[in-house]
From Swiss-Prot:
This is Photosystem II protein D1. Tyr-161 forms a radical intermediate that is referred to as redox-active TyrZ, YZ or Y-Z. C-terminally processed by CTPA; processing is essential to allow assembly of the oxygen-evolving complex and thus photosynthetic growth. Photosystem II (PSII) is a light-driven water:plastoquinone oxidoreductase that uses light energy to abstract electrons from H(2)O, generating O(2) and a proton gradient subsequently used for ATP formation. It consists of a core antenna complex that captures photons, and an electron transfer chain that converts photonic excitation into a charge separation. The D1/D2 (PsbA/PsbD) reaction center heterodimer binds P680, the primary electron donor of PSII as well as several subsequent electron acceptors. One of its GO terms (cellular component) is photosystem II. Chlorophyll a PD1 binds at residue 198. It is a multi-pass membrane protein. GO terms for molecular function: chlorophyll binding; electron transporter, transferring electrons within the cyclic electron transport pathway of photosynthesis activity; iron ion binding; oxidoreductase activity, acting on diphenols and related substances as donors, oxygen as acceptor; oxygen evolving activity. It comes from Conocephalum japonicum. The modification N-acetylthreonine is found at residue 2. The record marks 161 as: Tyrosine radical intermediate. Fe cation binds at residues 215, 272. Its EC number is 1.10.3.9. Chlorophyll a ChlzD1 binds at residue 118. SUPFAM superfamilies: Bacterial photosystem II reaction centre, L and M subunits (SSF81483).
């Protein structure tokens, strides 16, 4: 009898835990995805902060020339970064217990791999948690679908690209200047500026910013007046009120007269679908472009593609970019190789002496 009561009590505790995890009445929704999201994101954040402040230099190129990235080793907020895991480790799974000591783990850039893998798992669980909460509230799943765009972009630069290049040392450093360095090197090695998927991503990001600004300004400029002409239109509203505060017909009419009639939306759902879909699809394409360039399916190379009737080259902007790429590549890993492969492959001229 005693054993039966204890079993019921334990089942009751588990049931209460399940109800708490899946409850939509709590201040912050946990969810089953949150059970995994919380520890992984806390781990990634904690290790990032500690490593950004105090991590010793990392032998990123695997040639015994460590690169400093932390604040205590001479960097500031702009130049500081979590240095990627050493090329000597490659794509090997490198937890702390795989190293002979913590010093060796730090020297080989172990924190980068730890942060990146926990972060990617955490943001994927956050996306799942968005779907889970939407499902329990009876909502449609498009919030999680929209969030899949930045998740795909992060996965591309932190996981797919290193896999394609054969080493986590080619992943994006976790810092401001490290991000810019990654972008410059990516251009030098893959000519991303001439890749159509990157162009779609730029159109998505900048177009999304433009449309967001246009929509926000139209909404805040077309209030339904609840006051007299002698009072401010803002006086008729309370922050967070349930009643509609703007007139989409007025906004549609204004924008239609500003450009032309069919340039504006007269349906709120169509408008907001467009505002969500434009940047999301653009970022999806960018992530796909990074993932294909990871395996060296690079951007277009229109090298000296325009010539006159005499066969003389007429330079285009594509040629200017091609001229800049080797220079950027020379600056990258300057001690790992003397010249980029496309320069080193050229036969050296004979020197008479």
């Amino acid at each position: 009898m005693t054993a039966t009561l204890e079993r019921r009590e334990s089942a009751s505790i588990w049931g209460r835990f399940c109800n708490w995890v899946t409850s939509t009445e709590t201040r912050l929704y946990i969810g089953w995805f949150g059970v995994l999201m919380i520890p992984t994101l806390l781990t990634a954040t904690s290790v990032f902060i500690i490593a950004f402040i105090a991590a010793p230099p990392v032998d990123i190129d695997g040639i015994r020339e460590p690169v400093s990235g932390s604040l205590l080793y001479g960097n500031n907020i702009i130049s500081g970064a979590i240095i990627p895991t050493s090329a000597a480790i490659g794509l090997h799974f490198y937890p702390i217990w795989e190293a002979a000591s913590v010093d060796e783990w730090l020297y080989n850039g172990g924190p980068y791999e730890l942060i990146v893998l926990h972060f990617l798992l955490g943001v994927a669980c956050y996306m799942g948690r968005e779907w889970e909460l939407s499902y329990r509230l009876g909502m449609r799943p498009w919030i999680a679908v929209a969030y899949s765009a930045p998740v795909a972009a992060a996965t591309a630069v932190f996981l797919i690209y290193p896999i394609g290049q054969g080493s986590f040392s080619d992943g994006m450093p976790l810092g401001i200047s490290g991000t810019f360095n990654f972008m410059i090197v990516f251009q030098a090695e893959h000519n991303i500026l001439m890749h159509p998927f990157h162009m779609l991503g730029v159109a998505g990001v900048f177009g999304g910013s433009l449309f967001s600004a246009m929509h926000g300004s139209l909404v805040t400029s077309s209030l339904i007046r609840e006051t007299t002409e002698n009072e401010s239109a803002n006086a008729g509203y309370k922050f967070g009120q349930e009643e509609e505060t703007y007139n989409i017909v007025a906004a549609h009419g204004y924008f239609g007269r500003l450009i032309f009639q069919y340039a504006s939306f007269n349906n709120s759902r169509s408008l907001h679908f467009f505002l969500a879909a434009w940047p999301v699809v653009g970022i999806w394409f960018t992530a796909l472009g990074i993932s294909t360039m990871a395996f060296n399916l690079n951007g277009f190379n229109f090298n000296q593609s325009v010539v006159d009737s005499q066969g003389r080259v007429i330079n285009t902007w594509a040629d200017i970019i091609n001229r800049a790429n080797p220079g950027m590549e020379v600056m990258h890993e300057r001690n790992a190789h003397n010249f980029p492969p496309n320069l080193a492959a050229i036969e050296a001229p004979a020197v008479n002496g």
